Design a protein with these regions (language model features):
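Conserved AdoMet/S-adenosylmethionine-binding subsite of the radical SAM
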Residues: 1-71
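Auxiliary Fe-S-binding modules of radical SAM enzymes
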Residues: 45-265
Length: 265
């Protein structure tokens, strides 16, 4: 019934039968967009019970996005009127709960991966020992990122005593979906002369330079790595060691960008 109504699947029984066949004969990781009041709660548990019974390898929970700040950047929001997405922290708790309740691997996007500690596993206190492998920060810069990523990135740079780096989180929740509208909301008095924006931000370089220099201060705008961690969509077959190693590589690339664009003379 849910597939017929929400996915417009003309033959939902056949789709579920195919899912069962794949579960029983291959390593299948399913994915579901969790819409509050539609397929969460008891419905979600029923889905998980069925997947576990069929022998699924894993399940990726995907938080429903319904606003511009949640990632709908094409002016087509809301997708569903009258439905509010779960708060990010509450969604992360849901992922943790489902992972504990079932025998298959459960991850979530944008949060979290209970098995690896991601995203930003190196921000966790128990992983602080790995921060010694991040290069020394010699430059001075402002990092612009998403609302979700900002606290994690700030914590990491605080722990490595990078006093000349500050982190600004825009209201957009996903860093690679940052647009020029997000940059226009930034208080430029908090922005240093060198700025690092996400590598995959949806902002033209000329727009970024114009917007971030609108107060008369000509700023250098560089791009950091495409990613700084491994999202739950990609980490479901990773170990905690894999994630930490990847994050260290990406943060060293970020430090390289800071030291280059924010070189102090």
């Amino acid at each position: 019934k849910l597939r017929r109504e929400w996915v417009k699947d003309k033959k939902p029984e056949e789709a579920l039968k195919a899912c069962q066949i794949f579960c029983e004969n291959a390593d299948l990781t399913g994915a579901g967009v969790i819409i509050p009041g539609v397929n969460d709660g008891d419905v979600l548990r029923q889905t998980c019970n069925t997947l576990e019974e069929w022998g699924a390898k894993g399940f990726i929970l995907m938080r429903f996005a319904n606003t511009f700040n949640e990632g709908l950047i094409l002016g087509n929001e809301p997708i569903l009127k009258g439905i509010e997405s779960q708060p990010v922290e509450e969604f992360g708790q849901l992922v943790e709960e489902i992972n504990k309740e079932y025998n298959f691997r459960v991850t979530g996007t944008p949060l979290c991966d209970p098995e690896t500690g991601g995203p930003f596993a190196i921000a966790k206190d128990e992983n602080e020992i790995f921060l010694q492998f991040i290069k020394k920060v010699t430059g001075e810069a402002t990092i612009i990122t998403s609302k979700i990523a900002a606290p994690f990135i700030s914590k990491i740079f605080d722990k490595i005593d990078a006093d000349n780096v500050n982190v600004i989180g825009v209201p957009k929740e996903i860093a690679c979906l940052i647009t020029k509208e997000d940059l226009e909301q930034i208080d430029l008095s908090e922005v240093k002369q060198a700025v690092i924006i996400p590598g995959r931000a949806f902002v033209h370089q000329l727009d970024a330079e114009r917007i971030l220099s609108a107060d008369g201060v000509e700023r250098i705008v560089g791009r950091g790595p495409d990613t700084l961690t491994i999202d739950g969509e990609l980490s479901f077959d990773k170990t905690d060691e894999n994630v930490i190693e990847e994050e260290l590589t990406q943060f060293n690339d970020l430090v390289d960008a800071i030291n280059f664009f924010g070189m102090r003379i």
